[in-house]
Amino acid sequence: MSDVIALAKDLIRRPSVTPLDEGCQTLMAERLAKLGFVIEPMVFEDTTNLWARRGSEGPLFCFAGHTDVVPAGPLDKWHTPPFEPTIQDGVLYGRGAADMKGSLAAMVVAVERFVAEHPDHSGSIAFLITSDEEGPFINGTTRVIDTLEARHEKITWCIVGEPSSTTVVGDVVKNGRRGSITGDLLVRGVQGHVAYPHLADNPIHKAAPALAELAATVWDEGNAYFPPTSFQIANISAGTGASNVIPGELHVQFNFRFSTELTDLDIRERVEALLDRHGLDYQLDWTLSGQPFLTDTGKLLAAAVSAIEAVNGQQPALLTTGGTSDGRFIAPTGAEVIELGPVNATIHKVNECVKADDLDLLADMYQGVLARLLA
């Protein structure tokens, strides 16, 4: 069994469902301390974070990731217990195998091998690890970044170990992500009897044309790096459950995944102008989860593409599709940020798994990036 697989299994054994860490970061920190990393736990409320750094000079290369995992779901649907890592036919099963304890293991082993070969490497290497990525993301990476910013500690390059690959490890590098903003809309009407609509004011009827227009609007055309901005209604509710009562309120929750063609302010202004134009009596609360970011050029992207080609002979596709990641908190500092990790076909599913050999290849890729930037 390789060092990468052994560490991945040790991490998977710890049932670190958000926001729990269950000792995963301690396990990583013990190995990093032996390499000369300065270990700095950062605990905020219920979240465990780790900042570990080797070196004091720039440029600063950072591996970022999370030790928390989503709940296992129905245990009877798993071939093997989710927190008892098992290898069957060359495939490693367990919650977090792909998202993202396999990546964490590959990162640690890659650094161990790199430092052994280049003990006097240039610059610095760091790990930014949280137990709050799968949850509310309030006390995790964003708080660590705030701490680093306050003391003027700047990340130059960052690889987030999210499972970016689709078929073969390294076939996709995420060099950016769309922004995400959610609207919670309350439309007010007047409750009444369905037989006396003139004595009531149905908020569903009033809001329906506005919602239809929101859904039909082309918000932008996208660009060379991002698909067009998308609008989706996620939840809608109204009424008492009785068939003879006109509801007094309508609640709608919707989300935008937006490109760099728009800002969150653009979206807010356009949505509110549309609702005003339809004459609605409403309250709208916004939650911005993250701004879009893009690393279209730079040394990190070039090093990653070269390292991947050296390992699997394939040039990766550069994509910005998918959900958000903690890269959205790191990119605004000015760092070059990409995501590179294992195949994502089974993430958040029962029987989450990854090819064991893929994690060894991933470690080789990570080590190759370090060699191209800091050797």
Curated annotation (Swiss-Prot):
Cofactor binding annotation: Binds 2 Zn(2+) or Co(2+) ions per subunit.
Any one of the GO BP annotations: diaminopimelate biosynthetic process
Record function comment: Catalyzes the hydrolysis of N-succinyl-L,L-diaminopimelic acid (SDAP), forming succinate and LL-2,6-diaminopimelate (DAP), an intermediate involved in the bacterial biosynthesis of lysine and meso-diaminopimelic acid, an essential component of bacterial cell walls.
Protein family: Belongs to the peptidase M20A family. DapE subfamily.
InterPro entries per UniProt: ArgE/DapE_CS, Bact_exopeptidase_dim_dom, DapE_proteobac, Peptidase_M20, Peptidase_M20_dimer, Peptidase_M20A
Active site location: 68, 133 (proton acceptor)
GO MF annotations in UniProt: acetylornithine deacetylase activity; cobalt ion binding; succinyl-diaminopimelate desuccinylase activity; zinc ion binding
EC numbers, comma separated: 3.5.1.18
Protein name: Succinyl-diaminopimelate desuccinylase
Binding-site residues, Zn(2+) 1: 66, 99, 162
Catalytic function, reaction form: N-succinyl-(2S,6S)-2,6-diaminopimelate + H2O = (2S,6S)-2,6-diaminopimelate + succinate
Keywords assigned: Amino-acid biosynthesis, Cobalt, Diaminopimelate biosynthesis, Hydrolase, Lysine biosynthesis, Metal-binding, Zinc
Binding locations of Zn(2+) 2: 99, 134, 348
Cofactor section: Zn(2+); Co(2+)
Enzyme kind, highest EC tier: hydrolase
Self-association and partners: Homodimer.
Protein encoded by which gene: dapE
Pathway: Amino-acid biosynthesis; L-lysine biosynthesis via DAP pathway; LL-2,6-diaminopimelate from (S)-tetrahydrodipicolinate (succinylase route): step 3/3
